[in-house]
Regions:
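Glycine-rich, acidic/polar active-site loops that bind/position phosphate-bearing ligands
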Residues: 1
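Conserved glycine-rich FAD pyrophosphate-binding loop
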Residues: 5-136
Length: 136
C-alpha cells in the first residue's frame, strides 16, 4: 500500500500552504464541524517513515509523514497507544471534552519533576491550574 499525493500547481501552492498553516483548509474546517459534534482533533508526532496508521476517522499527513492530524471519536487511550506503538506521541488539539487530558499521562518520575517545577515557578498555583495535566 502506498501513500498517495498530487503535485500542486504553482498558482495554487501559496493558498494551499497558507490554508494548512492557518488551519483554514477543508480538512480543518471539517474537523471543526466534527469537534462540534463530539469528535476530537488529535496531533500525532511520529517518525516520518511510519506507515499509515489504522485509525478510525479522517487523517491529514504533513511534515514528510512526521505530523499526522486525526479527527476521530476514538477514546484518548486508542490514539496515545497507536502513537506510542510507533515511537511517537499524541496531543489532544481540539475537543469539547478534554477530561481525558491533553497530553499523555506522565510516568511517576516525570510527574514528580513537573510538580516540583510548577511549585518552584508557580508557588501559589495561579498559572493555568490543570491546563496541561489535570493534577498540576
Amino acid at each position: 500500500h502506498k501513500l498517495g499525493g498530487d503535485a500542486i500547481p504553482a498558482d495554487l501552492a501559496a493558498s494551499f500552504w497558507t490554508g494548512l498553516r492557518d488551519q483554514g483548509d477543508e480538512f480543518f474546517i471539517g474537523a471543526e464541524r466534527a469537534v462540534a459534534g463530539g469528535a476530537r482533533l488529535w496531533r500525532l508526532s511520529v517518525p516520518s517513515t511510519t506507515p499509515e496508521l489504522k485509525l478510525h476517522g479522517e487523517q491529514l499527513i504533513e511534515w514528510g509523514g512526521a505530523q499526522r492530524w486525526v479527527v476521530t471519536p476514538l477514546e484518548p487511550r486508542a490514539l496515545r497507544e497507536a502513537a506510542a506503538a510507533v515511537g511517537g506521541h499524541a496531543t489532544l488539539f481540539r475537543a469539547l471534552d478534554k477530561s481525558g487530558g491533553v497530553f499523555a499521562p506522565l510516568s511517576a518520575p516525570l510527574a514528580a519533576i513537573h510538580r516540583r517545577l510548577k511549585a518552584s515557578f508557580d508557588p501559589h498555583g495561579v498559572f493555568n491550574p490543570g491546563r496541561l495535566y489535570p493534577d498540576l
